[in-house]
Curated annotation (Swiss-Prot):
Protein name per UniProt: tRNA pseudouridine synthase A
Family matches, as Gene3D superfamilies: Pseudouridine synthase I, catalytic domain, C-terminal subdomain, Pseudouridine synthase I, catalytic domain, N-terminal subdomain
GO BP annotation list: tRNA pseudouridine synthesis
Record InterPro entries: PsdUridine_synth_cat_dom_sf, PsdUridine_synth_TruA, PsdUridine_synth_TruA_a/b_dom, PsdUridine_synth_TruA_C, TruA/RsuA/RluB/E/F_N
Subunit structure: Homodimer.
Documented EC number(s): 5.4.99.12
SUPFAM superfamilies recorded: Pseudouridine synthase (SSF55120)
């Protein structure tokens, strides 16, 4: 068997998430269906680096899969790309070693979250940015977000009842930008891993800080108390994008860790 790694992007609006599930349209199901056609009707299982939720988008999701023979990677990419549905794009395919695993090999993820703060909201962005109708002071959020950088126990920012025992993660970079022409806030987080709904909970908390309903020090309070009840609401999934995944064998991986 020959193992392939692929970078894919998708519009998550019409998907119930990445991972295959009964009676739902998922990214995994659509790609596996296409691979089956390219593999003479034989099943192919794909593995994803991140399991995005319903409505969540991706520019840089990474998958891997095995095929019984070596193929020209550009022809394979082209075949997959043209036969997958229009809301999935196969950006790049490369052959990798048999022991490569897109989820378990050491990597760094970058997530982006878009918030439309326009009043009125932009209806064209309804599937691609979460609307926040309340006034915010961006400088308050830019100050508060600094407290997320570093190695912390993020229990207070994950979904209640998660089965993951070790909730310590490292965020290498966290920032907020504002595109005034589009009334868009762009939150960017880069780290060695993120807990279930962690990014959406961090954004929900930062928005409450920006609105003045939580103090700038609230991030520190949540990290110390490890209490989800102290954090803000979970921001909607339509504003979330899996932007990039960098593996340890890439030079830029070590640059992030410095």
């Amino acid at each position: 068997m020959t193992r392939y790694k692929a970078q894919i992007s998708y519009d998550g609006s019409a998907f119930s998430g990445f991972q295959r599930q009964p009676n739902c349209r998922t990214v995994q199901e659509e790609i596996e269906r296409t691979l089956k056609r390219l593999n003479s009707g034989n099943d192919v299982i794909i593995h994803g680096a991140g399991r995005t939720d319903a409505g969540v988008h991706a520019y840089g999701q990474v998958i891997h899969f095995d095929l019984p023979q070596a193929r020209d990677v550009e022809k394979l990419r082209f075949g997959l790309d043209t036969q997958c549905p229009d809301d999935i794009d196969i950006v790049k395919v490369e052959q990798v070693s048999d022991d490569f695993h897109c989820r378990y090999d050491k990597h760094i993820k970058t997530y982006e979250f878009l918030v439309d703060i326009g009043r009125p909201k932009n209806p064209m962005m309804r599937n691609y940015a979460t609307h926040y109708p309340y006034p915010v002071i961006i400088e308050l959020m830019q100050e508060a977000i600094k407290d997320l950088v570093g190695t912390h126990d993020f229990t207070g920012f994950t979904a209640s009842g998660t089965s993951v025992e070790n909730k310590v993660r490292t965020i290498f970079d966290a920032k907020i930008q504002f595109e005034a022409s589009k009334n868009l806030l762009i939150f960017t987080f880069t780290g060695n891993g993120f807990l279930y709904k962690q990014v959406r909970n961090m954004v929900g908390t930062l928005l409450k800080i920006g609105n003045g309903r939580m103090p700038i020090s609230q991030i520190k309070t949540i990290l110390q108390a490890k209490n989800r009840d102290l954090a803000g609401p979970t921001a909607a999934g339509n504003g979330l994008y899996l932007k990039e995944i960098i593996y340890e064998d890439k030079e830029c991986f070590s640059n992030f860790r410095k």
